[in-house]
């Protein structure tokens, strides 16, 4: 596909000559983005356009967040760590360093921290900056925990309201180019999983990572209901490991 997540910066952010703001909302669904767009379109001051991008696999935060940064080379080190041009991209400071390596006039901040600033402080923060990344985590912080996942739809509604407010504030301080995107979405099922919903992975295959929706390993195998793709094809390198994933609505059986 032409619109790959890992090409986001080079195809969307980099070519802009004007100041550009990117808001990355963790696990913000495509459908939720449509709702946000509809709300913004009701205002005469906003002109919106929605496009898609194809996420890599596994479609999880530790792959998606680094992929949205400027990159020439992405490399999976194992242990849930994806390097960007040989650098870690786990926390805010590391991501800002990567941004500033490509564009020195770059900043990164949590959206909630930005919204807590006064209007004067917000203007001061963005002045002289070319690229600004804001990180937003309302949906994933709720939906990725068993104790709170039942509240994920309320979290989506809260996220839409927070993003709407964020766009409002940015427009007030004369930011014109604003991109709202996500590292991945989510799949939600109301009923409890039983044995018929689960796929047993081969016991004689070693996996570096094994999750409900994906597994990473070096040995290919044939199993009904399981597809795979080479990690190198996802990252654009020569990594020969495989990402395995259910080809239907089922999940992998994990401890």
PLM regions with names:
Residues 1-255:
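Feature captures the catalytic ectodomains and active-site-proximal regions of enzymes
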């Amino acid at each position: 596909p032409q619109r790959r997540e890992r090409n986001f910066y080079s195809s969307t952010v980099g070519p802009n000559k004007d100041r550009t703001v990117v808001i990355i909302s963790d696990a913000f669904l495509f459908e939720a983005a449509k709702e946000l767009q509809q709300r913004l379109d009701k205002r005469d001051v906003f002109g919106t356009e929605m496009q898609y991008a194809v996420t890599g696999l596994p479609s999880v935060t530790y792959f998606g967040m680094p992929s949205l940064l400027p990159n020439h080379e992405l490399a999976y080190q194992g242990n849930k760590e994806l390097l960007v041009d040989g650098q870690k991209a786990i926390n805010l400071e590391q991501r800002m360093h990567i941004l500033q390596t490509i564009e020195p006039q770059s900043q990164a901040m949590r959206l909630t921290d930005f919204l807590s600033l006064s209007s004067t402080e917000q203007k001061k923060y963005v002045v002289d900056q070319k690229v600004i990344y804001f990180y937003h985590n309302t949906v994933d912080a709720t939906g990725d925990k068993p104790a709170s996942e039942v509240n994920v739809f309320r979290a989506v509604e809260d996220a839409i309201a927070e993003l709407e407010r964020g766009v409002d504030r940015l427009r007030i301080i004369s930011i014109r180019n604003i991109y709202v995107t996500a590292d991945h979405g989510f799949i939600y099922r109301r009923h409890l999983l039983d044995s018929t919903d689960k796929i047993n992975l081969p016991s004689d295959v070693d996996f570096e990572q094994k999750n409900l929706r994906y597994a990473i390993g070096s040995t290919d195998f044939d199993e009904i209901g399981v597809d795979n793709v080479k990690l190198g094809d996802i990252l654009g390198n020569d990594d020969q490991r495989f990402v395995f994933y259910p080809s239907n609505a089922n999940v992998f059986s994990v401890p």
